[in-house]
Amino acid sequence: MIDIILATYNGEKFIEIQLLSLMAQSFKEWRCFIHDDGSNDKTVEIVKNICALDSRFFLIEDSVRLKNPGKNFIHTLSYSTSDFVCFCDQDDIWLESKLEKLYASICHKNNEIPQVVFSNAYCWNSEKNIIAGKATLAFPTDIESLLFLNCGIQGASAIFNKKMKEILLVPIEKLVMHDWYLTIAGCSLGQIDYLHENLMLYRQHGNNFTGSTSSSFRTKLKNFLKTNNSLIDENHFESLMSFYEVWGDKLLKNDSRKINAFIASISQSRLKRFLMILQGNWNIYGSRLKLVIKFFMRPYFGGKK
């Protein structure tokens, strides 16, 4: 059994087709727990109609309002009891083999330890009806390939086991996003692997954003050359500090050393920061060179502008 965790908010334009794509999955042994965060449109009405059609959908009506998508996902996750879990975004469309392939990729692993397997997606411009490119261009599987990204894997592309769920249900004070928590937990407290397949349509519109997404060469170059954003985003850094406060004593010594070096670099000289990058295996998008270029082009630490 796989539990699908769906956090909704004002998703009336997209939610129905996403729920129908879940119903069309070739893997049938699933349940979907849905929690709405106070929508003022027809999202809840649409969900209730689907629940009446398929008993595998469960709308959680507990009057809890988080006003934060990451916290909403983690709250909804607390209702899961199955061995495996998938997050689900309200505005994507899952290809029919998504659950089947993700389950096949994780079920034979050592599930006595926390496990995550993530996949990719097709970028979909629903307004122009264009499908092109991969949604994810970064594939972090360790601390040094994650921390400078200022994002995590695409949470809705992943499957994880009960051991990982137990980690995610331990609260951290500054939670930037649920999928960042999933990523850093996989990189430091368990095992995280990439399945080289596109298993859903990632809808691109003005209200969503996924770090490290594919686009035209001109757009990618423009984003890469931006100098008004810092190399280390303040919100992700605060989330890292909160994570380390809770889980620091459970990390391997090598990972703990890397996180400590990363945290300490905020207050160090430019030279020491640069030497840290060169002495380790720090990278973005699998490339140290790209990280070095950004290092010299951007402020080191701060918020996004």
Feature names for model-found ranges:
Residues M1-S215:
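Nucleotide-sugar donor-binding/catalytic module of glycosyltransferases
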Residues L175, Y181, R203-K305:
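C-terminal subregions of glycosyltransferases and related glycan-biosynthesis enzymes
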